[in-house]
Amino acid sequence: MQQTVIEKMLVISTGHLPKEVMDDTLAQIDNQIYIGMTREEGCLLHIPSTEIEKYSPDLYYIMEFAQHQQCEWVLFDRDGPTYNNLPTFDW
């Protein structure tokens, strides 16, 4: 019998990224530079196991936060929760 694989995902508001970083992230996913999928409400982004420091500082900080929660994915959702320990941006 094959083992079931389950991966954790951090759900977070798109407001934790500046608009230009979110727009760039969506473009990088669409261009298959980042692994994920875009959606009207935000995006689903895979967190690579290495070299997350090459991402923008705002995105890196969220990826690092997600990794500390043992997450392999981040779901950015416009209606997602905000976290007091992370900066937020108005757009």
Task: Indicate where each model-derived feature is located.
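Short, compact, well-ordered microdomains
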Residues: E53-W91
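Acidic (Asp/Glu-rich) sequence patches and key acidic residues
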Residues: M1-E53
